[in-house]
Structures are given as structure tokens and as C-alpha cells.
């Protein structure tokens, strides 16, 4: 079966610095896949290379079998991929509902607001609150909701639980798990190992810009030497 998202031989640079070396990965429809690794290993660069924020100098990226490598990020977004940046990137001067409506303006298809609010009841309660008045967890929920309202085939999450209280992390893990159970495909980068392994069915370990290991999430739990070697845990 053809993968929903497939990358082969990605090589990406920042200036003259070679960051990714022949990175290949596959994500099937309705799958949750995680990229693990130390800080600076190349995980976020992998997401940005898939999304077109960073243009790979070599390699292939296919979304449902259609080549998208080299396209601008807005074109890749229209094709069905959304990236939620670590910085969240919401409009602080707009309220929650305005943020959502603005995100859906240029979408080829979009979710109705009530569907979004059904997944994120906190956002419905705060729908008239400005982005700057939201907590960090609420801002992250809004960032994810802004991506989902565009009805993406796959959503890329860059450090979605970073800096959030444990209670909010558990709530976001539950929400992401429900999205996955309903068929949403997710590729995430995250340092919170417990949260990641609670969500992902499969993981890639990125080390110094290379794919060092790929396998089921349960295997990572059962092989502490992998955690020690590549994550320092």
C-alpha cells in the first residue's frame, strides 16, 4: 500500500551546514509516527523539510504519491499538509474564533467551527478571548485547531508539549489520540518520551542528521540501550 507521506534521501542545509543526511521515512494513513532524538539531531529540520519551510537540496517527498519536494510551504499546505510550529504562531491580537476563521479562509476544504469546538471545548469557552490572554496550553490547542480547520491529510507537530503543565500535556495527548482514532494522520517531534510513546505506534530515531533506528514504539520501551545511546536517558 502506498504511504500517505514518503520521504527518500532528504539532504537539507542551513547555509553551508549540512543538517540532514539521506533521511528517509514513511507514514501511512491514520498512523501516528514520532521522531525522537537529542536536541539538535535534525528532527525539527526534518519536519520543516517535509513542509517546504526548508528546501531540501536533494531527495524526494511524496504526498499520496505526488512529488512535493521543492514546492513552497503554502502550496504544500493546499495539498493537504499542515505544520504546527514550536512557536505556535497564533494571532495574539485576534480572539480565538477570529484566529480559526482566518486560518480557514484560504482552505480548499475546512471544518465547521462546531467540529473544532467539539474537540477543543476549552477553545469554545474562550472563543472571545484574545490570543495573548490564553494560557500556554490554550495557545497550543488553538495552534493545532488552526491547522485542523483546514482539513489536512497529515498534521506535523513540532514539540507540541514543550513547556506545558503535566495536566495540559495529558489533555493534549488524549485529544491527539482521539484524532488519530478518528483517522487523522500525525507526525510529531517531541522530547516528552512518555507522552510520545503513549501516542505513537512507530518511531524514527534521528541522530546527527541520520535515521539511526526505525521500529515500533513498544520496542523503544523494551530496549533501554537505544534510549541511552541516542537520547541519553
Task: Show where each model-derived region lies.
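Glycine-rich phosphate-binding loops of nucleotide-dependent enzymes
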Residues: 2-233
